[in-house]
Amino acid sequence: IILSIIGIKTEALMVRHIVLFKLKDKSEENINKTAEVLLSMKGKVPQIRGIEVGRDFLHSERSYDIGLTVTLDDAKALDDYQNDPYHCEVVKKHMHAVRESSVAIDYYID
């Protein structure tokens, strides 16, 4: 909204979607399986322009276990990504089963 107020057309800006997950089962096996499921979207979800999955190495009290970063063409692509059949049926289903909690941010890349 602020960008559109100052004259930047947000519909033309790329979007970065970042989600951090705390998992119920923090075993290396579960974290690796979850990373594989997230990365399996590459090539299957057409809106994705870039994807990264990272595993936490500090393991502090405030740490999340795994992070997902996705780059998309625009806000419409983000909406399409959120509703993509593979994302909904495979990824969301797995993540809802294994996550304890999650936080997300979506922002424009200028």
How should each PLM-predicted stretch be described?
Residues 99:
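Non-catalytic beta-sheet/beta-sandwich ligand-binding modules that flank or precede catalytic cores
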